[in-house]
Amino acid sequence: MVRLFLGFVEAPFFPGAIYFLSCWYTKREIGVRMALLICGILLSNAFAGLISAGILSGMNGVGNLASWRWLFIIEGLATLVVGVIALFVLPDFPSTTKWLTQEEKVIAQGRLAADAGSDSVLDEEKVPITRGLIWAAKDPRTWMFACLQMATTASISYSHFFPTLIKQLGFKNNTTVLLLTSPPYLVAFCWALSWAWVADRRQIRSIPAGISQCLAMVGTILLIAIGDSLWARYGFSFLVACGTFGVYATTYAWLSSTITQPPIKRAVAIGLANTCANIASLFANYFWLDQYEPAYRQSWGCLLAFQALGLSCILTIRFTLKRANKKFESLSNEADVMDPLFIERLNADERKAVQNGFRYIV
């Protein structure tokens, strides 16, 4: 029951945080910010190993409590303290943040409206969540990104079993195993953040995501081919970590800068993509059964299949958005020769955004 309650309150945090960032930053700024949020997972994985190693080796029996109990107490208290602080220091949306002046609110909303190609800097009219759900569900791009996120989450499933994979190197001491889990995540943190910076600076998304996906596939293929070499396996895990988290740190920024109008549609699209990603967590854990020890070739083979699916999604989204941008140019410059069926598929907000110069980031 405790785990059920924990999952219930945790579930909305990540998509809510993604949507929150998209309500403050333009598409030229959001990549690095979202990468920092997502790279928090990498830092938590890296330092959780270090913290766990220290607690498990040094606090067993303190206060007549087992070390694993201290692990939950310390990490739980840290989360609680940060959550309470966030209640007071985290701003609300640009239109409702109390400590912003009216002029600052208009500026904050205006820069986002201009970025999305909208004329209005005022609060949008309240739209029912059901309407946003219908809009998002009928948009093929929502499901392209949802499929990409599902494939990426399945590819990251190895991280849940990384300590077990490290044990296959021959280490029996749990402290040593936990310490060895940190370096791949720290390197992946630098990789993901660097590519997010490049993506923002160059206003590209598919190329960084595609390069990271290819790197993950190379690492996975090498793990399958040279799985008997223990330290080679550890080295190749760096490639997989960099690649998979490099994709993960890029795609949510890509989604939020693609489905921009209206905001309720963006919120639902982010939620649907995150839901599909969580579905992957349900089945991907079964890739790592004990019967696949010690090389886990079948497990890595499953990951390779989902990485290939992710790469195909990246290429499909790139092709779809590039073709849409070409049609947008026609709509802006030569509306009289524009495909009328294409125009009908755009809602009023999207049509206005296109005429104001909005283009997808590819």
List where the protein language model places each region:
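Paired small-residue
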Residues: 1-5, 231-239
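Cytoplasmic helix-loop-helix junction between adjacent transmembrane helices
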Residues: 2-40, 55
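Intracellular juxtamembrane helix-capping segments at the cytosolic ends
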Residues: 12-26, 246-262
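Glycine-rich segments within core transmembrane alpha-helices of 12-TM secondary carriers
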Residues: 31-65, 72-79, 270-284
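Extracytoplasmic gate region of multi-pass secondary transporters
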Residues: 49, 131-197, 248, 252, ...
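Interfacial helix-cap and linker-helix signal at transmembrane-aqueous boundaries
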Residues: 51-61, 166-167, 198-200, 287-295
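Intracellular terminal tails of multi-pass secondary transporters
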Residues: 87-122, 272, 297-362
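Structural signature of the two symmetry-related core transmembrane helices
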Residues: 207-222
